[in-house]
């Protein structure tokens, strides 16, 4: 039986939300939005996450065509169990302090101060004049957009959520997975950009880790019981 669109959508939506809330890129988006125009930060982060989700789903969609569906199913099931155990372990180790938020903030602070020192030599009036003379496309793809895009892209590359998305796309309907993933990324990133540091600091990394661990294990059990053909 072919994997359903709704099944792929709901699994991808739930997995991505729990993986991204409290993630390094979530904190980065919140902090960047405090220092730069929100619309540019949101556009850069969302574009990056959409591209990353599409790439991950494409890899997962191609995998069953290169390797036996039976093997991709078993690998995906194993990944769910491994990520579930790792997430639970990380959740139990958390002491309640938002260490990742502090780490991301320190990294961005150093980068921000460096850029600020370089920009002091330029006249604000000249910058505004140049900006007005640039076409809209070049204004949109500004250094701020590129910065938000690159920080998010490289922060997500090789991340647990990316690997899980590849595995999910190999075992579920890829269109459902990409739709659920993009919607979840949009919800999380918008919340981070609009809520800023005040929202980010309220997130319990311990609870997020434990919740995502339980969800990964649940997906692993469902995948194991359904078998390669997707029948429970």
Curated annotation (Swiss-Prot):
InterPro entries registered for this protein in UniProt: GDT1-like
Membrane topology recorded in Swiss-Prot or TrEMBL: Multi-pass membrane protein
Disulphide-bonded residues: none
Keywords: Membrane, Transmembrane, Transmembrane helix
Gene Ontology MF, one: calcium ion transmembrane transporter activity
Membrane-spanning parts: 13-33, 40-60, 72-92, 135-155, 175-195, 207-227
Short name of any one Pfam family annotated for the protein: GDT1
Signal sequence coordinates: none
Lineage top rank: taxon: Eukaryota
Gene Ontology CC terms, in alphabetical order: Golgi apparatus; membrane
Main subcellular location: membrane
Intracellular or extracellular location(s): Membrane
One GO-annotated biological process of the protein: calcium ion transmembrane transport
Family (UniProt): Belongs to the GDT1 family.
Protein name: GDT1-like protein 5
Organism: Oryza sativa subsp. japonica (Rice)
């Amino acid at each position: 039986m072919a994997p359903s669109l709704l099944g792929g959508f709901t699994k991808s939506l739930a997995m991505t939300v729990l993986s991204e809330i409290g993630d390094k890129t979530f904190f980065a988006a919140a902090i960047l939005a405090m220092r730069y125009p929100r619309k540019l930060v949101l556009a850069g982060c969302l574009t990056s996450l959409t591209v990353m989700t599409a790439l991950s789903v494409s890899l997962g969609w191609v995998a069953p065509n290169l390797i036996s569906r039976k093997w991709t199913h078993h690998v995906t099931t194993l990944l769910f169990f491994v990520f579930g155990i790792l997430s639970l372990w990380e959740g139990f180790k958390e002491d309640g302090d938002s260490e990742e938020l502090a780490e991301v903030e320190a990294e961005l602070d150093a980068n921000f101060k460096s850029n600020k020192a370089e920009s002091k030599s330029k006249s604000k009036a000249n910058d505004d004049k140049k900006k007005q003379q640039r076409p809209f496309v070049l204004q949109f793809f500004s250094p701020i957009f590129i910065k938000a895009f690159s920080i998010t892209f490289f922060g997500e590359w090789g991340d647990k959520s990316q690997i899980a998305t590849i595995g999910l796309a190999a075992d579920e309907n890829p269109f459902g997975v990409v739709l659920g993933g993009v919607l979840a990324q949009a919800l999380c990133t918008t919340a981070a950009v609009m809520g800023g540091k005040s929202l980010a600091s309220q997130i319990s990394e311990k609870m997020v880790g434990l919740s995502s661990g339980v969800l990964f294990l649940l997906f692993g059990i469902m995948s194991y019981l359904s078998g390669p053909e997707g029948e429970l």
